[in-house]
Amino acid sequence: MDNKIVYVVSDSVGETADLVVRAAMGQFPFAPDIRRVPYVEDTGTLKEVISIAKSNQALICFTLVKPDMRQYLVTEAAKEGVEAYDIIGPLIDQIEEITGQVPRYEPGVVRRLDEEYFKKIEAIEFAVKYDDGRDARGILKADIVLIGISRTSKTPLSQYLAHNKRLKVANVPLVPEVDPPEELYQVAKEKCFGLKITPEKLNHIRKERLKSLGLSDGATYANINRIKEEIDHFENVVSKINCQVIDVSNKAIEETANIIVNAVQNQKMF
């Protein structure tokens, strides 16, 4: 048997049915002629496919999640003497029986889940690439830009937003001795968020950081006057950008992230 025609019918892209058919056909010594019929939404299309399949003595394999569409195809194909194989329906029915849960009957769910997964991975990779001001070009590409002095949770917040909200985040450290990148003044202020912290809180955090590294907590890094100088520089930069400032002194990463996400969503509404 050469080039047996198989019509792959789906209410979405049809990738699932296509893969299953190819896997099954791979067990036989003939080359299948697989013809995909995607995004089927009405019985008229099904009737047409049945007619064509009959004239070509073809097999129909389908993934239709809506029960009425599945039943129509099976019934009408049988009337015309056309073999129609339901790839996903019996499994959906079995899972419903075992769990007692009603299916959503939404076409293309797997595809949407795959897209969400890859968006998350892309966002995580972006956060790593443009962490700590490594490449200023990321500022203009980012969904969100975080700015702040050292130890204001820029990196963990970037990763949290990437992993949980699928947002591409670049973060930029501010140091008095180094001019901020020009891109920081070019980005839309609505995308930019300054992370502020009290001198006392930051002094404690930095001292603990130095201790964890086996260093003296008397270093300039944890000096209160140095910290105040850095905060003054931060205030000067954010005033020029005119971006929203969030006090992270007593906030968990999740809380700060929610403030940012809500701000972004509100901007999109108006």
From Swiss-Prot:
Bifunctional serine/threonine kinase and phosphorylase involved in the regulation of the pyruvate, phosphate dikinase (PPDK) by catalyzing its phosphorylation/dephosphorylation. It comes from Bacillus anthracis. It comes from the Bacteria. Keywords: Kinase, Nucleotide-binding, Serine/threonine-protein kinase, Transferase. This is Putative pyruvate, phosphate dikinase regulatory protein. Belongs to the pyruvate, phosphate/water dikinase regulatory protein family. PDRP subfamily. Its EC number is 2.7.11.32, 2.7.4.27. ADP binds at G148, I149, S150, R151, T152, S153, K154, T155. HAMAP family: PDRP.
